[in-house]
Amino acid sequence: MKYRRLSLAHARQDSGQAASNARSRRFARLLCSSIAPLALGFSADAFAADETMASPFNRGAPNDAHGNLLDEIRRGVPLRHVPASERNTRGAGGSTLADAMRRVIDSRRTAFDSPPATPASPSPSWSDDESPPPTPIATRPASRPESAARSPRHSSPPHSPPASAESPSPRSPDASPSRTPSPTFSFPSPSRTSTPRTQPPSPLRERPERSPAASPRVASPRSAHSRGSTQPPSNLSTPRYEPPTPLQEDPERTPVASPRVASPRSAHSRGSTQPPSNLSTPRYEPPTPLQEDPERTPVASPHVTPAEHAQRRPFLLQKPPQVPSWRKKAPSATLPDSHAPARPGGGQFTTPASGAAKYVAVNSGASDAFAAGVNAVAIGADARAQGQESLATGWRAQADGHRAVATGARAIASGRDAVALGAGSIADRDNTVSVGQRGSERQIVHVAPGAQGTDAVNVDQLNLAISNSNAYTNQRIGDLQQSITETARDAYSGVAAATALTMIPDVDRDKMLSIGVGGAVYKGHRAVALGGTARIGENLKVRAGVAMSAGGNTVGVGMSWQW
């Protein structure tokens, strides 16, 4: 329902009449029974009305104040009473206002009391001249737990069943069950100044699921004393709003919070302005630095067997050894066999100092690592890094050379910039990489083909190179053999041709011309020659011939002078 606010002094007036008017007193009682639960911080869903109507109050008020009457009163909007002559014709005042207030009271009573109690006596008649008193509308009781925890923000008085249909009348927290009812109180005089009071947050704006700890049963601020008295009861204390502590947590947002939260206010003094002495503010205690996470620490699980515990237990980061001064002479390099024997006993284990250290484990009882060189690093039992900027990792690994690296058990790198990879590897020459030692060689496997001139080649690249070289050599040798064969054939044919030319007979002394044919064979190569001799003078003679063979043709000419 929407109403307009008016001041408490105006609430006692009706068309300019005094507060003794019966209608004004009834309205004041209804107004008090509806506002007090809101001031105590009760849930707002119990005061929801079924319909919205115009209020005869604050019509034409400054700042154009509109809205629910209860909400406006809680926010401090000044209320102004509208006389009957200014009311609308639709019955927006009088019995309609009483009907709305009865709906609010009935909704509150039904929501917090299930089922509602039957009133002991009928309600007083409503002396309104506009309409007869309406019948209260029954609303469906809201489902609330009977034993909900009290909210830590607002404490509520204990619950007691209602005493009448207009307003429930619970017992005061400090009143006894046999106490006689006290007279009803009315509003104070308009001239009396009231002390400003801090209002709690509006329950109408809070969501029910955000206040799970509110009490499902709300007690009425009105006492069960007689309604004829004009003085307020002595045992009625005004509740004060107390803001929650900074460390106070929402039970719904905090999974580990208890479902039943105790009220921070003491039940013995709800009207006191001083906090109770037995109320202690919870303090936040941070976890210790060495506190373990059960999910991240394997040894915290109760289902780990002793064997698994021995494998998964953490280790202790030992204190680094003391590095000797540069003025001291470093011990000479020795072989691993000359190292001191390992001390008996197992390594000490404890929780690692950081989360990343749990991925490193050391299990050895040998001597400590020793790094004598400048900027040298030695990791492992009895590891020795004696060269400058050297690195020795592994049991009894030894790096003696400058910037040498020895990785593996008993690995030795004594050369300058030498690298010994693997257990027992020895790199004793400068700028070398060793993967073994003489008599205990190793293969370097899974090597990619080399791409640059200084890259290593694998077996596939070597076989391809050999194959290409063999093919080239064979081709060249074949060509050479062919050339030699052809040369021999020509030579043999030439010898046969020359022999065939010499076989032609000469001319006689008494003849002038002679023609002859000759032939010869040399190592399987044959030749045929044709020639002739002519006597030109008595003392002069000329001779010519041609020989033919498989290697080619041969031509010869000769002349002789005789005396």
UniProtKB/Swiss-Prot annotation:
Q: Where is the signal peptide?
A: 1-48
Q: Which UniProt keywords are present, listed alphabetically?
A: Cell outer membrane, Membrane, Protein transport, Signal, Transmembrane, Transmembrane beta strand, Transport, Virulence
> Any stretches that span the bilayer, and where are they?
510-519, 525-536, 543-549, 553-563
Q: Where is this region: Translocator domain?
A: 510-563
> Region (Disordered) spans which residues?
1-20, 109-350
Q: Which GO terms describe its cellular component?
A: cell outer membrane; cell surface
Composition bias (Polar residues) maps to 228-238, 269-281
Report a single Gene Ontology molecular function: actin monomer binding
Top-level taxon of the source organism: Bacteria
Q: Where is the WH2 domain?
A: 65-82
Annotated spans, Outer membrane translocation of the passenger domain:
473-509
Q: What happens when the gene is disrupted?
A: During infection of host cells, loss of actin tail formation.
Renumbered to this chain, the Low complexity biased-composition regions fall at: 138-150, 162-197, 211-227
Q: Where is this region: Surface exposed passenger domain?
A: 61-472
The subcellular localization recorded is: Cell outer membrane; Cell surface
Q: List the InterPro entries.
A: Adhesin_Head_dom, Coiled_stalk_dom, Pilin-like, Serralysin-like_metalloprot_C, WH2_dom, YadA_C
Query: Which residue stretches belong to region Central and acidic domains?
Result: 96-130
* Subunit record text: Homotrimer. Interacts with host G-actin; the interaction is direct. Interacts (via central and acidic domains) with host ACTR2/ARP2 and ACTR3/ARP3.
What this protein is reported to do is described as: During host cell infection, required for actin-based intracellular motility. Mediates actin tail formation at one pole of the bacteria surface by recruiting host Arp2/3 (ACTR3/ARP3-ACTR2/ARP2) which leads to actin polymerization which provides the propulsive force for intracellular movement and intercellular dissemination of the bacterium.
Instruction: Spell out the family assignment given in the record's similarity comment.
Output: Belongs to the autotransporter-2 (AT-2) (TC 1.B.40) family.
Q: What is known of its domains?
A: The central and acidic (CA) domains are required for binding to the host Arp2/3 complex, Arp2/3-dependent actin polymerization and thus for actin-based motility. The transmembrane domain is required for polar localization at the bacterium inner membrane.
Q: What is this protein called?
A: Autotransporter BimA
